[in-house]
C-alpha cells in the first residue's frame, strides 16, 4: 500500500525532477550475401522515409554475411577489416547526404556486423559505449553462430542493440531460445578480447 502511494506521489511531481526528449532511431537489417559494393554505392532507397519526417538521431545497420563464411574464418573467427571499413564508409557517405552523421562504433563476428551512427547534434549526449561479441557455435567456441552487441546511453536512457545469427529451421526453436538466453547472460559479463568499452562518444 505504502509503495503504491509513494509511486503515485513521485509520479505526480515527476516534472519537477525529470525532463524528456524524443529520440528517433532508424534500425535496418540486411543480408548482403558477401556483396562487395563500390565506394560510390547508392543507398538512397533505404532512406526514403527520412524526407519530410525529420532525420533520426540514431541510425543502426545490422548486416549479415558481410563476408562469406569459409572453413578458415569459421574456426579462427577472423574479420575482414577492410570490408567492414568499406561498408562503414559507404553507409556514412550516404547518411551525410541527409544530415551531419558520425560513425560511432561497429562490432563484427565473421560476417555479422553491427554499425552505430548518430547525428553530430547529440554526440555529447552519447555515453557509456560498449561492444561485445558472443559465440554460440559448437559449445560457444566457434563464431559460425552467435551475435554482436552494442550498448550506449543517451542522457539517462540506455540502449542495447543485437545482431545475431542463430540456428535455422522450425525444428531449432528451442535451440534459438537457449542461444538468446546465453547471449543475454554472457554479454558484457566478463573481461576479454570480445569486450570494448569507452566512456563517451569519441569521433
For each of these PLM feature ranges, what is it?
Residues 1-108, 112-115, 172-175, 179-184, ...:
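N-terminal, active-site-proximal structural segment of metallo-dependent hydrolase catalytic domains
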Residues 73-167:
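Structured beta-strand-rich core segments of catalytic domains in phosphoester-bond hydrolases
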Residues 125, 132, 140-144, 153-155, ...:
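Eukaryote-biased recognition of electropositive, low-complexity segments
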Amino acid at each position: 500500500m505504502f509503495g503504491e502511494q509513494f509511486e503515485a506521489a513521485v509520479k505526480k511531481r515527476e516534472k519537477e525532477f525529470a525532463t524528456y526528449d524524443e529520440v528517433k532511431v532508424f534500425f535496418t537489417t540486411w543480408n548482403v550475401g558477401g556483396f562487395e559494393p563500390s565506394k560510390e554505392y547508392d543507398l538512397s532507397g533505404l532512406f526514403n522515409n527520412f524526407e519530410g519526417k525529420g532525420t533520426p538521431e540514431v541510425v543502426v545497420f545490422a548486416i549479415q554475411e558481410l563476408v562469406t563464411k569459409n572453413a578458415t574464418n569459421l574456426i579462427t573467427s577472423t574479420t575482414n577489416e577492410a570490408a567492414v571499413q568499406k561498408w562503414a564508409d559507404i553507409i556514412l557517405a550516404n547518411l551525410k547526404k541527409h544530415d551531419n552523421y558520425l560513425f560511432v562504433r561497429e562490432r563484427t563476428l565473421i560476417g555479422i556486423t553491427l554499425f552505430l551512427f548518430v547525428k553530430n547534434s547529440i554526440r555529447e549526449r552519447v555515453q557509456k559505449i560498449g561492444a561485445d561479441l558472443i559465440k554460440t557455435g559448437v559449445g560457444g567456441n566457434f563464431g559460425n553462430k552467435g551475435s554482436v552487441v552494442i550498448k550506449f546511453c543517451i542522457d539517462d536512457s540506455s540502449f542495447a542493440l543485437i545482431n545475431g545469427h542463430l540456428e535455422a529451421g522450425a525444428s531449432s526453436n528451442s535451440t534459438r531460445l537457449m542461444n538468446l538466453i546465453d547471449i543475454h547472460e554472457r554479454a558484457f559479463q566478463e573481461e576479454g578480447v570480445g569486450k570494448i568499452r569507452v566512456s563517451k562518444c569519441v569521433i
